[in-house]
């Protein structure tokens, strides 16, 4: 619920500007109005106009999430003249934040075998840190990476606990 609220507040801060169906010029729209120190809006720009401003060698999987959203958003902009990039990115961020919390809790509870209270407190502590909480609302790749890292810790931890080797799947 908190992740939904934060993303809603971010979108509402410049709603009419962020959802303009501009034909090009998304760099100016987003960089002029999105100000979050240390975080960029390149995901919105990529979904809006397929201009890639991040290093794809370091984030190859991330582009595979964004490209289908670009195609859908491009069609929607042509059809209704409205940019849905901020909503598409918010769905990815909320989904990733929720599962990052879930996998982190499960690592504490099932892999490390902590009590429910301790696992809950440590999960809440982790997500109370600013550089963990802020990525759950900004259009950046950090929370997606946290979800995959916590998922990897959970899967590898459960395999280690059972004494099994990791397989291709």
Residue ranges of each PLM-predicted region?
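Transmembrane signal-anchor helices characteristic of membrane glycosylation enzymes that use polyprenol
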Residues: 1-50
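Membrane-water interface at transmembrane helix exits
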Residues: 10-14, 70, 74, 105-113, ...
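Short hydrophobic/aromatic helix or loop-helix immediately within or flanking a transmembrane segment
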Residues: 49-83
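Loop-to-helix entry region of an early transmembrane alpha helix in multi-pass inner-membrane enzymes
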Residues: 76-99
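Transmembrane-helix signature of polytopic, membrane-embedded enzymes
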Residues: 104-128
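Short acidic/glycine- and proline-prone juxtamembrane loop motifs at membrane-interface regions
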Residues: 136-143
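Specific aromatic-rich, kink-prone transmembrane helix
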Residues: 144-161
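Short hydrophobic alpha-helices at membrane interfaces in multi-pass membrane enzymes
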Residues: 160-169
């Amino acid at each position: 619920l908190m992740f939904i609220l934060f993303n809603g507040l971010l979108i509402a801060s410049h709603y009419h500007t962020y959802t303009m169906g501009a034909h090009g010029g998304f760099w100016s729209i987003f960089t002029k109005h999105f100000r979050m120190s240390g975080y960029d809006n390149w995901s919105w720009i990529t979904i809006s106009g397929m201009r890639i401003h991040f290093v794809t060698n370091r984030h190859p999987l991330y582009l595979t999430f964004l490209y289908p959203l670009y195609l859908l958003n491009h069609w929607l902009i042509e059809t209704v003249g409205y940019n849905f990039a901020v909503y598409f990115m918010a769905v990815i961020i909320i989904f990733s934040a929720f599962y990052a919390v879930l996998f982190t809790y499960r690592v504490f509870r099932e892999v490390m075998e902590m009590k429910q209270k301790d696992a809950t407190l440590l999960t809440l502590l982790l997500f109370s840190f600013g550089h963990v909480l802020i990525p759950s609302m900004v259009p950046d790749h950090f929370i997606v990476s946290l979800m995959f890292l916590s998922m990897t810790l959970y899967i590898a931890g459960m395999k280690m606990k059972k004494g099994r080797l990791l397989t291709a799947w």
